[in-house]
Amino acid sequence: MKKTTLLVILDGWGYSESDYFNAIKNANTPTWDSIWQDFPRTLISASSLEVGLPRGQMGNSEVGHVNIGCGRVVYQELTKIDKAIEEKTFGNNKAICDAIDNVIQKDSNLHLMGLLSPGGVHSHEEHIFEMIKIAKQKGVKRVYLHAFLDGRDTPPRSAESSIKKTDDLLQKLNLGYIASVSGRYYAMDRDNRWDRVEKAYNAIVNADAEFVCNSALEALEESYARDQSDEFVIPTCIQKDGKLIKVEDNDSVIFMNFRADRAREISHAFTDENFDHFPKDRHLNINFTTLTEYDSKLKCNVAFPPEQPVNTLGEVLMKNHKTQLRIAETEKYPHVTFFFNGGKEDQFEGEDRILIPSPKVATYDLQPEMSAPEVTDKLVDAINNGKYDCIVCNYANSDMVGHTGNYEAAMQAIEYLDKCLARLKDAILEHDGNMFITADHGNADMMVNPKTQKPHTAHTTNLVPFVYVGHKKAQVALEHGKLSDIAPTILNVMNIAQPQEMTGKTIFKFEK
């Protein structure tokens, strides 16, 4: 029977001394309080340069899990793309040039689509603006933007500024206009809710939508009048002089999101010949280009293909003939598998995976416990049966409920998690295992913006906890640690040598 080392990632569980609408601090958490008091712990960085993002940029789940799993700072697509723009190499990118050459040669339209937002989590509006300028410089005649609106990694009603900037730029360059708008709830689903994706797809491709407006700003105003914030704007087509824009054969479409998980579904709708998740009247004969690789199975051009890290935690465990389990509910399953393995879809030898379905509710404040009880049942079973040397799990609650902006529901989510932690702690200590508890970024630690007094639905840049629970004596050996130091710490407690590719340092020193 194996003594399990368990890594618990509490998604969106940041640390803040402030109790102002801090769902984590103000919730009733007897287990967490006792763990924080009785076991070795520290705070580590999960944002900014320490995780390969631009200075001051909040972390996110994808970035967090890549850094944790790789055991080194992994420079993120946002940083890579910013660098290409800064060094003026963005416009020379082969995939981008091919998409632009296609429309120039065929006198067709260039469609840009993506999250029009300064959020920097799934996209950045500056990349879209740069793309529009490059299209103009290279002689493209018509550019149409299909804008997905945020309100999740940005304040819920903040899209007006982004739309105005885009309208001004397109007007100044006399190049085109925003041809459709959709809330990210529809265009960027990641949980197989294809009815949502269908609405966004039809608005973009077929100019077929429930609403038609004369401008993107008008569409936004009408949505607010229906009490639908940015995230939930129903896909709307924009007409100019009575004309609606469709995606036609020979057009080029460039998807400007750089994060994969919420870009996959609609990309498959554009590119899969045998797509069957909703009816399509035709298969598009277009140049479809994505800024980064969303899925290796997609038939498209990729502007910034992934760099494959070697000797990630999962790979090192496999090479040392260790068994491992990855477990999460649907919302965070890609994070403990694909992202944690450094962008590899395939399982390692000796790696098992358990996917617990997320509840089918419109928003998770309606069910703050989400699927945490089921995740915990499976975890406790796995610890008790001693099958695995290492288990990595993710609890989605503090992030997904945090994103709703519902403070009371977020506190309920934290209290559910506290009960789950009690069960895990008991199981680990009973079987003489090791448990590390951390987070990939903050969220529920600030549910209301103290400056604006409005709901805060985005991530925070706060530090996150890193705690050791077990019978070994441990001391903090590293001040100012970061997410990339977690994998070396796990290898240390498991007495496995750290490979040179892992540049992180061990956070705790354990008495042998």
UniProtKB/Swiss-Prot annotation:
Pfam families the record matches: iPGM_N, Metalloenzyme
Gene Ontology terms describing biological process: glucose catabolic process; glycolytic process
Organism domain of life: Bacteria
EC number from the UniProt entry: 5.4.2.12
A GO cellular component annotation in the UniProt record: cytosol
Reactions that this protein is recorded to catalyse: (2R)-2-phosphoglycerate = (2R)-3-phosphoglycerate
InterPro entries noted in UniProt: Alkaline_phosphatase_core_sf, BPG-indep_PGM_N, Metalloenzyme, PGAM_B_sf, Pgm_bpd_ind
Active site feature: S61
Enzyme class: isomerase
Binding-site residues, substrate: H122, R152, D153, R184, R190, R259, A260, D261, R262, K332
Disulfide bonds: none
Residue numbers binding Mn(2+) 1: D399, H403, H459
UniProt similarity note: Belongs to the BPG-independent phosphoglycerate mutase family.
Subunit composition and interactions: Monomer.
Name this polypeptide is given: 2,3-bisphosphoglycerate-independent phosphoglycerate mutase
Species per Swiss-Prot/TrEMBL record: Francisella philomiragia subsp. philomiragia (strain ATCC 25017 / CCUG 19701 / FSC 153 / O#319-036)
